[in-house]
């Protein structure tokens, strides 16, 4: 096709599909890290297109911290069943036995043990050598400098000072035994691109992205939704019902909502056109310390 006749979304779609096919042709045991959010929804849709009329030749994998929103878990199970895809759910059982949770142990320790260590356990257990993720360069500064093929050593660590050049659409996938890569087909997409594509392709997403009245408490400058009975309320804290939605989704105690009236996709897109803040501002794990995301990625985080 002539690139000059493609819309920018079709160009992004074509690039992402090319990346999926390249990885499947080069690696023995790929997997898609399915975190249930909007980026995962788009990534899954692109994977279905890339291998149509067949199904993607790799499973989905969700590293479950046990603290995701209930709506996310219900959506995950329903979507995998609808599409007839293999879904691997991995939980760091040692972390569960230790009672690790974000309220008692804080966001950093919770993320390190239940997400990062859980992910490394799963990759080792199933011997995956390539893992697709939905990260985008516009999300956060450490992700802005990460390549589409992000190489990890045998301990799953990332070295930002030792990345391979990527010229045009040429990717070097050679790895040594025990090494692996993380692959980001949405690297060049923006948050607005994602929402426009969801609208144009009619992609199902978790209802939490749409504004609705929900029980929240204001804590550390963020609106935290009271999603289940495990959330301890501080002295004098009373949940309020506010019309909110989420720009990003993670563990519910670590994810801030925003007040919004955007209850449809066109309204969300209009909101995105006017916003001047990053979606990651609603993720407490990004505020642990300066450069916290880069440090997490060096240790094996998504």
UniProtKB/Swiss-Prot annotation:
Pfam families for the chain: PAPS_reduct
Gene Ontology biological-process annotations: hydrogen sulfide biosynthetic process; sulfate assimilation
Enzyme Commission designation: 2.7.7.4
Catalytic reactions of this protein: sulfate + ATP + H(+) = adenosine 5'-phosphosulfate + diphosphate
Gene3D superfamilies reported for this sequence: HUPs
CDD domains in alphabetical order: Sulfate_adenylyltransferase_2
Pathway named in the protein's UniProt entry: Sulfur metabolism; hydrogen sulfide biosynthesis; sulfite from sulfate: step 1/3
Keyword vocabulary terms for this entry: ATP-binding, Nucleotide-binding, Nucleotidyltransferase, Transferase
Presence of the UniProt keyword 4Fe-4S in the record: no
Group of enzyme by EC: transferase
Family in the record: Belongs to the PAPS reductase family. CysD subfamily.
Cited function: With CysN forms the ATP sulfurylase (ATPS) that catalyzes the adenylation of sulfate producing adenosine 5'-phosphosulfate (APS) and diphosphate, the first enzymatic step in sulfur assimilation pathway. APS synthesis involves the formation of a high-energy phosphoric-sulfuric acid anhydride bond driven by GTP hydrolysis by CysN coupled to ATP hydrolysis by CysD.
HAMAP family the UniProt entry points to: Sulf_adenylyltr_sub2
Subunit structure: Heterodimer composed of CysD, the smaller subunit, and CysN.
The protein's name in its UniProt record: Sulfate adenylyltransferase subunit 2
């Amino acid at each position: 096709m002539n690139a000059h006749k493609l819309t920018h979304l079709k160009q992004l779609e074509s690039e992402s599909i090319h990346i999926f096919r390249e990885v499947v042709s080069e690696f023995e045991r790929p997997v898609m890290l399915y975190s249930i959010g909007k980026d995962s929804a788009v990534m899954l849709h692109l994977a279905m297109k890339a291998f149509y009329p067949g199904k993607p030749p790799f499973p989905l994998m969700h590293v479950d911290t046990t603290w995701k929103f209930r709506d996310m878990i219900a959506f995950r199970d329903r979507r995998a069943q609808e599409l007839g895809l293999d879904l691997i759910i991995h939980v760091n059982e040692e972390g569960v036995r230790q009672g690790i949770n974000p309220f008692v142990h804080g966001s950093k320790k919770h993320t390190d043990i239940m997400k990062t260590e859980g992910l490394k356990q799963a990759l080792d257990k199933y011997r995956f050598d390539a893992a697709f993720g939905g990260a985008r360069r516009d999300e956060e500064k450490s992700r802005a400098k990460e390549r589409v093929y992000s190489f990890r050593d045998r301990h799953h660590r990332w070295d930002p000072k030792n990345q391979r050049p990527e010229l045009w659409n040429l990717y070097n996938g050679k790895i040594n035994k025990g090494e692996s890569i993380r692959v980001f087909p949405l690297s060049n997409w923006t948050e607005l691109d994602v929402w426009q594509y969801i609208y144009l392709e009619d992609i199902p997403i978790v209802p939490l992205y749409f504004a609705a009245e929900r029980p929240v408490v204001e804590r550390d400058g963020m609106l935290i939704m009271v999603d289940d009975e495990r959330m301890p309320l501080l002295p004098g804290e009373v949940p309020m019902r506010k019309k909110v939605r989420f720009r990003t989704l993670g563990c519910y105690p670590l994810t801030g909502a925003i007040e919004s009236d955007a209850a449809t996709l066109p309204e969300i897109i209009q909101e995105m056109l006017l916003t001047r803040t990053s979606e990651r501002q609603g993720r407490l794990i990004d505020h642990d310390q300066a450069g916290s995301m880069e440090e997490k990625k060096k240790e094996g985080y998504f």
